[in-house]
């Protein structure tokens, strides 16, 4: 579909069809949504600022969409996971109510796939919140956990 949209709109074109297919369902998880962007954060003030900002909420270009989907397919291939440095520390973090990560289940599945591939140091933590966990009200907890994870791995 990206290829067809690229023919129609070009590499730097923006496709409403692709945007709706990729992001359109996210808000459906929140029946009380007030804006098309409520899936981003549970804090209404953050969502209001995001919605009002002309630099936020733009549809991705067709080229970016295609590359993002290609990257997702690439990392999901078991052979590619096997090539990763097994000693590399990996910390998966996500919002428990993030529809992008299937309400945390997709993130836990990704962490499990890394472990199954033999990665030796994989941590996964879900936080209360939606997609932008660094903009949620308890964001300091996320920052503290990320800092603690990296401090444990500094030589």
How would you describe each model-predicted region?
Residues 1-55:
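Alpha/beta-hydrolase-fold enzymes
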Residues 60-82:
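Active-site nucleophile elbow and catalytic-triad environment of alpha/beta-hydrolase enzymes
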Residues 67-70, 109, 141, 145:
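Alpha-helical elements of Rossmann-like donor-binding domains used by nucleotide-donor carbohydrate transfer enzymes
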Residues 81-86, 117-119:
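Short, conserved loop/helix-junction motifs that constitute active-site signature segments
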Residues 92-94:
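Short beta-strand/loop motif that positions the catalytic acidic residue
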Residues 96-99, 129-130:
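Acidic beta-to-alpha connecting loop that harbors the catalytic carboxylate
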Residues 99-109:
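Conserved alpha/beta-hydrolase "acid-adjacent" motif
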Residues 115-155:
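Catalytic active-site module of serine/aspartate enzymes centered on a nucleophile-bearing elbow/loop
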């Amino acid at each position: 579909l990206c290829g067809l949209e690229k023919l129609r709109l070009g590499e730097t074109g923006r496709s409403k069809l692709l945007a709706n297919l990729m992001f359109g369902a996210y808000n459906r998880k929140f029946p009380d949504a007030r804006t098309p962007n409520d899936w981003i954060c549970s804090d209404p003030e953050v969502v209001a600022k995001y919605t009002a900002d002309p630099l936020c909420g733009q549809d991705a270009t067709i080229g970016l969409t295609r590359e993002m989907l290609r990257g997702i397919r690439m990392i999901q291939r078991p052979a590619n996971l096997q090539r990763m440095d097994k000693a590399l520390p990996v910390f998966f973090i996500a919002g428990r109510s993030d529809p992008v990560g299937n309400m945390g289940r997709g993130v836990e599945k990704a962490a499990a796939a890394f472990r199954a591939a033999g990665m030796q140091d994989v941590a996964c933590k879900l936080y209360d919140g939606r997609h932008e966990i660094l903009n949620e009200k308890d964001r300091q907890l996320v920052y503290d956990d990320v800092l603690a994870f990296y401090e444990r791995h500094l030589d």
